UniProtKB/Swiss-Prot annotation:
<dbReference type="InterPro" id="IPR055188">
    <property type="entry name" value="Choice_anch_I"/>
</dbReference>
<feature type="region of interest" description="Disordered">
    <location>
        <begin position="202"/>
        <end position="284"/>
    </location>
</feature>
<feature type="compositionally biased region" description="Basic residues">
    <location>
        <begin position="246"/>
        <end position="257"/>
    </location>
</feature>
<feature type="compositionally biased region" description="Low complexity">
    <location>
        <begin position="223"/>
        <end position="245"/>
    </location>
</feature>
<dbReference type="Pfam" id="PF22494">
    <property type="entry name" value="choice_anch_I"/>
</dbReference>
<feature type="compositionally biased region" description="Polar residues">
    <location>
        <begin position="258"/>
        <end position="267"/>
    </location>
</feature>
<protein>
    <recommendedName>
        <fullName>Gigasin-3a</fullName>
    </recommendedName>
</protein>
<dbReference type="InterPro" id="IPR052956">
    <property type="entry name" value="Mesenchyme-surface_protein"/>
</dbReference>
<feature type="compositionally biased region" description="Basic residues">
    <location>
        <begin position="268"/>
        <end position="284"/>
    </location>
</feature>
């Protein structure tokens, strides 16, 4: 970099500084082959674009990483590898793509839009609520598929304490599409070979509502601030009724912790949104 050369900083490529950070070799490149700016890769957050103009009206900024560092510090930017201790992988993906927001699903709660964001590496789902014009987002809670940070990733998996790692895809099923008649969130974990069903409770009128107001004047783009008090995980457990698979077999799962309660306020009425653990299929 010209900036580093002028200041005689040869150690800028040291691993403890910027040496391990993956950056583009094309963006910021000058004619002489040097770079005056660095462009790192995405995967650390998510954005909302208008479908008609492709204008970006919201960006999560650094809130995904910051919230994971606060709520799940031992899983922060971790990477599941069978033979490695879970805590030893903490911060191991910070120089690459961080949490890697990989999958997304949308639900509706009255005039609010609920967005579920699946993060690949830590195996988590961040839940956000938006106003009707999708310009103001608030982090509500984070669900983690890792029920322990003790031992290796492989030991946690064998003990049934690890699910939904590498959330390649998530899908929200409204009541009229759900086999239970209740709102469901379907989550796949490619690393763990699992498919999980979660009951989504507390949604106000959870039917799809395509009348999202996109004509409201857009506010300047900015990252949403981290809530003053971050929701903590509840210690309550629940046992949902078994769900039949397509083969007709009943899949019985273990009890799981619920995520922390999430509160929304509509017309001075408080409603809670929380997961209820559903059943899982057999691991591949």
């Amino acid at each position: 970099l010209q900036w580093a050369r002028k200041r005689k900083i040869p150690s800028i490529q040291h691993d403890a500084l910027l040496g391990k950070l993956s950056v583009s070799t094309q963006e910021g490149r000058l004619r002489d082959g040097t770079h005056d700016k660095l462009y790192s890769y995405g995967g650390r957050g998510f954005s909302v674009l208008r479908s008609d103009t492709m204008e970006r009206i919201y960006d999560s900024g650094s809130i995904v990483e910051e919230s994971h560092a606060m709520q799940y510090p031992k899983l922060f930017n971790s990477y599941a590898k069978s033979s490695v201790n879970i805590t030893d992988t903490q911060d191991s993906r910070s120089d690459s793509k961080g949490p890697e927001c990989e999958s997304l699903a949308v639900a509706y709660s009255g005039t609010r839009v609920i967005v579920f964001v699946g993060c690949e590496r830590p195996g988590t789902i961040s839940i956000y609520s938006f106003n009707s014009n999708m310009t103001e987002g608030t982090l509500e809670s984070i669900y983690s598929g890792a029920k322990t940070v003790l031992g290796t990733w492989g030991e946690a998996f064998d003990g049934g304490l690890l699910t939904d790692m590498d959330t390649d895809d998530i899908k929200y099923l409204p009541p009229f599409q759900s086999p239970t008649g209740q709102p469901l969130l379907v989550v796949t974990g490619s690393d763990t070979g699992t498919v999980s069903l979660f009951h989504v409770r507390g949604l106000d009128n959870p039917l799809p509502n395509p009348r999202v107001n996109s004509r409201v004047p857009v506010k300047p783009l900015q990252s949403s601030p981290l809530p003053e008090s971050t929701p903590k995980s509840s210690t309550k457990t629940s046992s949902a009724s078994p769900i039949k698979s397509r083969q007709g077999k009943k899949l019985r799962g273990k009890k799981q912790n619920k995520t922390g309660n999430t509160r929304f306020t509509y017309r001075n009425n408080k409603r809670n949104i929380k997961f209820k653990a559903g059943r899982k299929n057999n691991r591949n």
